[in-house]
Amino acid sequence: FDPHQEVAGWPMVIDIEETFYFKPDGRQLLASPCDEAPMAPCDVRHEELDVAIAIDRIQSATTMEIRHVTSAWAGLRTFAPDRRPVVGWDSTAPGFFWLAGQGGFGIMTSPAMAATATAAITGGSVPEGINPERLGPNRF
C-alpha cells in the first residue's frame, strides 16, 4: 500500500503477537496479516477478508491510514515439523540436498540459508552462529 510518506529507511515492523507485519518495498509498504491456513499445494490466491484484516490490524496499531491497496497476493509457506528451516544432505536419499521450510521467513533468511547450503555442499565454513545439525534433515 501507499503510505503517503517516505518509507525507504523504515525497518521491517512486526507486532509483538505476530498478527501483522509491514516493511518497505520501494516507495510503498508490503504488509501481511501473518495468517496461516493449512492447505494442499495449489495456486493460492489472496482472500479479500485477509486484506481487510491486515488493514485493520495495521491501522489499529499505528497512526497510518490505509486508503488504497496497490496490489494483493498470497503465497504458500512451507514449515518443517519444528518450524525451523531444513538445510542439508538427506541420509536416506543419496545425492538429495534439502533447502526448504523457511515458512514466512524465506526472503529474510535466504542469505544465511544460502551460505549454510554452500558450506554443506562445498565443505566450506558454516556462517558463525549457525549450527547445521539443528537445521539438517536428519534431525527428524
Positions of PLM-derived features:
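Active-site lid/adjacent beta-loop-alpha segment flanking the redox-cofactor pocket in flavoenzymes
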Residues: 2-95
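C-terminal catalytic lobe of FAD-dependent flavoproteins
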Residues: 59-140
